C-alpha cells in the first residue's frame, strides 16, 4: 500500500459514495485507475465493505451508551459474540484488553430499553459484570473499521 492508496482510503472514509471520477481527481488519477485501486484494496481485504452512517436519534434510538462487559467464567467469547450480534440495539462490539472483556456501543430508544438490554446480557448473555456510560455527544466519527 502506497501514499496514493492511503489518500484513496481517506477520501472513501469521508465519502463512501464518491464517484470514481471524483475520487481520481482528488488523488491525481484517472477514474479507471482509481477504480482499479479500489478493486485491488477490496480484493486484498483492506476495504472490507461500504456502510451507511446512521443518525440513531433520527432513527428513533436517541440514547447511545458504551457498555464495558466482563464475561462470566462459564461463558465463551464465541457464545457472547453470537448472542450480541442478534441484539438490535448493539451497533458495535469490540474485544478489549484490561479489566473488561468487551465494549459494546448500543443505541436504545430510551432508558427502559437500555435496562432491558443490560438485564438480558446478565441473564442470557453470559455476562458477569457491566459498566455503562451514556454518550452525551459524539465529537466525530471516522469511516467504518
Where is each model-derived feature located?
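A compositional/biophysical signature of low hydrophobicity enriched in polar/charged and small residues
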Residues: 1-145
